[in-house]
């Protein structure tokens, strides 16, 4: 399908890159231009980790998301240019066109639902339902275009399951859960300037490198498809990060977290590298597992779990969840004890007028790093977390191209 003139890059990718660079300029320009509009609409808030009471525009992910969509809407004809010349195209590749449109529909739905969350401040149960609904077009595209639900079984399990295993509907459940996880994973690992956009930028850069390496492989078309989305996403996110970096002049909002997560889910599923995609999310997976006791309210969870600012030192310190000891269930007590023994949490107990109370640090990767390294300046904490994301990507490439031999025949 992708038979284009010999260029350093295929023509559609070159057009995509040029459009993405224009998208970077547009994002950098539009965000300050719309600042007053968001503040007038009361889509603004204060940075809780700053002494300043200045109002900062929120939900700016809707701007980078809109620029991203405009780039790709204008780009739609270019992968199919050969079909405009009759002798170069025997039949129009409808399945590839459907994949492109279906992917854009899923991302567009997620941007809309994310913005609705920012405006309406939805509950957590809704945050799980929204990505599920937005992923349905994606699953239908996979069903109509591919429909393959058979996986290659890793070597250690082949003596039980055989070489191949057809998961059937469970494979679609897995893809739906992947979309839900990706959209919420970035949202959970958030709360300091530049972190949401920064981690997304590192992940997208890692995927771009992975796609470029795989262009010489057997699945060239899938990785070109992924690049069509990742290159514009990288540059629009870079424009957003320019304004969101410490000290942040804008907040990205849940809109960006959902937009980023669904974009990653789209390329992972339709690009057929969902396992590699999950490896790029190692810090987010750890943060999710570490946060589970609070997310399921086994251990009391405050509305905001971001670290707190020490006004005297100007550094961030761990934030805590304080609750009555008698209100903690047996399971919560057990989890807290195990986590304390593993030095994953700091627990304080004491007495107050209301009786015995327990206090533990909020269970996020951000607070865990503050527990390990002590109080850190916000900018340095963001850099530390992004360094961890880069190391995670390096580990992913090592697993994907070296350790994979232990599990699969490559």
Swiss-Prot record:
Q: Which residues lie on this side of the membrane: Cytoplasmic?
A: 41-60, 121-123, 189-194, 245-252, 296-377
> What organism does the record attribute this protein to?
Mus musculus (Mouse)
An MF annotation (GO) of this entry: UDP-N-acetylglucosamine-lysosomal-enzyme N-acetylglucosaminephosphotransferase activity
Q: Which residues bind dolichyl phosphate?
A: 127, 180-188
Cellular localisation: Endoplasmic reticulum membrane
Q: In which pathway does it act?
A: Protein modification; protein glycosylation
**Which positions are glycosylated?**
148
Kindly state which reaction or reactions the protein catalyses. a di-trans,poly-cis-dolichyl phosphate + UDP-N-acetyl-alpha-D-glucosamine = an N-acetyl-alpha-D-glucosaminyl-diphospho-di-trans,poly-cis-dolichol + UMP
- Report activity regulation: Inhibited by natural nucleoside antibiotic tunicamycin, which acts as a structural analog and competitor of UDP-GlcNAc.
**Ligand binding (UDP-N-acetyl-alpha-D-glucosamine):** 46-48, 58, 193, 303-305
Q: Which family does it belong to?
A: Belongs to the glycosyltransferase 4 family.
Subunit description: Homodimer.
Q: What is its EC number?
A: 2.7.8.15
Give the protein's recorded name.
UDP-N-acetylglucosamine--dolichyl-phosphate N-acetylglucosaminephosphotransferase
Q: Which cofactor does it need?
A: Mg(2+)
From the record, give the transmembrane residue ranges: 11-40, 61-80, 94-120, 124-145, 169-188, 195-215, 221-244, 253-271, 274-295, 378-402
What is one Pfam family matched by this protein? Answer: DPAGT1_ins
State its role.
UDP-N-acetylglucosamine--dolichyl-phosphate N-acetylglucosaminephosphotransferase that operates in the biosynthetic pathway of dolichol-linked oligosaccharides, the glycan precursors employed in protein asparagine (N)-glycosylation. The assembly of dolichol-linked oligosaccharides begins on the cytosolic side of the endoplasmic reticulum membrane and finishes in its lumen. The sequential addition of sugars to dolichol pyrophosphate produces dolichol-linked oligosaccharides containing fourteen sugars, including two GlcNAcs, nine mannoses and three glucoses.
Residues engaged in binding Mg(2+): 187, 254
Mention any one GO cellular component term assigned to this protein in its UniProt record.
endoplasmic reticulum membrane
Q: Which GO terms describe its biological process?
A: dolichol-linked oligosaccharide biosynthetic process
Q: Which residues form a coiled coil?
A: none
* Keyword Signal assigned: no
Q: What happens when the gene is disrupted?
A: Mice die 4 to 5 days post-fertilization, just after implantation, suggesting that protein function and N-glycosylation are essential in early embryogenesis.
Keyword tags? Endoplasmic reticulum, Glycoprotein, Glycosyltransferase, Magnesium, Membrane, Metal-binding, Transferase, Transmembrane, Transmembrane helix
Pull the Lumenal topological domain ranges from the record. Answer: 1-10, 81-93, 146-168, 216-220, 272-273, 403-410
């Amino acid at each position: 399908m992708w038979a284009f003139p010999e260029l350093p890059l295929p023509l559609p990718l070159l057009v995509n890159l040029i459009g993405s660079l224009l998208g970077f300029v547009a994002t950098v320009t539009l965000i300050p231009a719309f600042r007053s509009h968001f503040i007038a609409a009361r889509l603004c808030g204060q940075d809780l980790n700053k002494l300043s009471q200045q109002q900062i525009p929120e939900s700016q992910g809707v701007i980078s998301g809109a620029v991203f969509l405009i780039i790709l809407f204008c780009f739609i004809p270019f992968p199919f240019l050969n079909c405009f010349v009759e002798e170069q195209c025997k039949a129009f590749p409808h399945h590839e066109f459907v994949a492109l449109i279906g992917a854009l529909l899923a991302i567009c739905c997620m941007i809309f639902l994310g913005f609705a969350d920012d405006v309406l401040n939805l509950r957590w149960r809704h945050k799980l339902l929204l990505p599920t609904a937005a992923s349905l077009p994606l699953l239908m595209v996979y069903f109509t275009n591919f429909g393959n639900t058979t996986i290659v079984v890793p070597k250690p399990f082949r003596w039980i399951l055989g070489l191949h295993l057809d998961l059937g509907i469970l494979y679609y459940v897995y893809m739906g859960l992947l979309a839900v996880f990706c959209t919420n994973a970035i949202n959970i690992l958030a709360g300091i300037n530049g972190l949401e956009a920064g981690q997304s930028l590192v992940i997208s850069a890692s995927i771009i490198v992975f796609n470029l390496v795989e262009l010489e492989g057997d699945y060239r078309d899938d990785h070109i498809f992924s690049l069509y989305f990742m290159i514009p996403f990288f540059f629009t996110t870079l424009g957003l990060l320019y304004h969101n970096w410490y000290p942040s002049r804008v907040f990205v909002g849940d809109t960006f977290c959902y937009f980023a997560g669904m974009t990653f889910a789209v390329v992972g599923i339709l690009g057929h590298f969902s396992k590699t995609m999950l490896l790029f999310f190692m810090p987010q997976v750890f943060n999710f597992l570490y946060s589970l006791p609070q997310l399921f309210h086994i251990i009391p969870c405050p509305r905001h779990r971001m670290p707190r600012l020490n006004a005297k030192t100007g550094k961030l310190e761990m934030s805590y969840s304080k609750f009555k000891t008698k209100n903690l269930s047996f399971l919560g007590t057990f989890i807290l004890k195990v986590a304390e023994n593993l030095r994953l949490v700091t627990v304080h107990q004491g007495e107050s007028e209301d009786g015995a109370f327990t206090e533990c640090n909020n269970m996020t990767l951000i607070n865990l790093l503050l527990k390990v390294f002590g109080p850190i300046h916000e900018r340095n904490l963001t850099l530390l977390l992004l360094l961890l994301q880069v190391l995670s990507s390096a580990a992913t490439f090592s697993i994907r191209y070296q350790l994979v031999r232990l599990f699969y025949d490559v």
